[in-house]
Amino acid sequence: MTDAAAFWQQYLSTLPATHPHHNAIYEAWGFGDSAEMADELGQLVLAGTKTATASAVKEYEADGERIPPVGDISIILDGQNRPLCIIETTEITIKPLNKVDAQFAWDEGEGDRTVAWWLAAHERFFRRLYEKHGWTYSADMPTVFERFKVIYTAS
């Protein structure tokens, strides 16, 4: 059993037998594109500072994955693929990257939490992603703006 699967079973053991999460399908993943970023952003989630994330619609399409719906469950991993917590998606909005608003930038919990900082950091991140795939980056690229809440931590 993987660490994530064991963590999931630990979470389920805290729930009543009739809870719908006993039948839920989860994904396990870390934030960002490096172990360091997964560690840093995972800690922001654990601290309650980070309650939102953004991802490229194009990446979901290229990977043949669905955009997470409200109610989606994920195990958040650190940079060594160890489980940190379980989150539940509470809101999904799709709009151009450069249409981020101040509240979302704040909720992402990164840097100084301003729109200017958020846009600069996410442009760097998405330029790396797009370059890796041979795609052409655009500031108005369709983006999944996701809000979530932590529903379980080990401690």
Segments from the language model and where they lie:
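Mixed-charge, low-complexity intrinsically disordered regions
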Residues: 1-86, 95-155
